[in-house]
Amino acid sequence: MAVPFYLPEGGADDVASSSSGASGNSSPHNHPLPSSASSSVSSSGVSSASASSASSSSSASSDGASSAASQSPNTTTSSATQTPMQSPLPTDQVLYALYEWVRMYQSQQSAPQIFQYPPPSPSCNFTGGDVFFPHGHPNPNSNPHPRTPRTSVSFSSGEEYNFFRQQQPQPHPSYPAPSTPQPMPPQSAPPMHCSHSYPQQSAHMMPHHSAPFGMGGTYYAGYTPPPTPNTASAGTSSSSAAFGWHGHPHSPFTSTSTPLSAPVAPKMRLQRSQSDAARRKRLTSTGEDEREYQSDHEATWDEFGDRYDNFTAGRERLQEFNGRIPPRKKKSSNSHSSSSNNPVCHTDSQPGGTSQAESGAIHGHISQQRQVERERQKAKAEKKKPQSFTWPTVVTVFVLAMGCGFFAAR
């Protein structure tokens, strides 16, 4: 049976509940229903969860409407939350709330079993589904009487509430895990509870608790974690227990990094490890190795590029190709493309014993050829220049003359 609960700060009057419904916490369970009405709504939502989302929303609303009408004969509009104790809400809001609720149920029941964990949360970088409360054993320190969960997470200002509302991972009803990770409390404050939901709560409590937070928010792009039954893989619970995360289920997040840097961290770590490996490889070789091409363990392109840079450092830095360039014919396109296809092949295939002097001579030859080429191209460009220079001048003069003519005519 679903348990109705009230907004803590709003005072639970009609104005607060309707405004919360308008502000996007669209769920029929924000509003103080009588328990029978809310249970009928939840049962209709469960029964219609297997149908398509649009039809199921309409059927759920009609079911709820019929049950509400049977309770109070004076209500005629088809609204599931319209009870005598409340001012009526506009029907489209209620329909939208029901639709969201049913879609949440559906996505939880038919979610593909691809990922085993909810996505990384911005405010808590524990990934396992059962971090704070291991599935098998109920939490020893939890209160015997769980408090009614609250829709607002006791922030001081509403902006923070909205910020965290967008980035909630969507919990599954059978998770005893935290549905709303709270932001890091100040370190001087007494430890906040890491989650609102305790293992003793019924599974119906969770949809109430998570529905106000939208469908997973924009941050996760509609991803809802697949249902993990209470008998979750023992591997995850035991491995996360091995790291000692279960020891302090109520302590503040002392081990979390700054909220938004958590998703970025693995990528940075990967890049750093790769570059470290390359640097280590480079440092193991001797200095002479770097200068001459006699090393037997020329492994990566990285190292190859580094050594190549080392012994071409003294020469001109801006080179057209690394390889040897055959003298060009008049039609430069064919040979140009063929030589650009294998830029490194010639220097790569030098025998291991070529000394630095030989390679230096080769490079001197290449640079001479290159200078000759450049001079040729400069000469060509200078020939072309007068022709190409006359056209723009002619055009600009013509345009200016036309403009002056227009002005004079005015």
From Swiss-Prot:
Species annotation: Drosophila melanogaster
GO cellular component: cytoplasm; mitochondrion; nucleus; plasma membrane
Protein keywords: Apoptosis, Developmental protein, Phosphoprotein
Function: Activator of apoptosis, with grim and rpr, that acts on the effector Dredd. Seems to act genetically upstream of baculoviral anti-apoptotic p35. Blocks Diap2 from binding and inactivating the effector caspase Drice. Might regulate apoptosis downstream of Clbn/NEMF.
Protein name: Cell death protein hid
Entry keyword Phosphoprotein: yes
Biased composition range(s): Low complexity: 13-27, 35-70, 134-145, 230-242
Region (Disordered), start-end ranges: 1-88, 126-207, 230-301, 319-386
Lineage: Eukaryota, Metazoa, Ecdysozoa, Arthropoda, Hexapoda
Subunit organization: Interacts with Diap2 (via BIR2 and BIR3 domains).
One BP annotation, GO: entrainment of circadian clock by photoperiod
Similarity remark: To D.melanogaster grim and rpr.
Biased composition regions of type Pro residues, renumbered to the chain: 170-189
Modified residues (Phosphoserine): 295
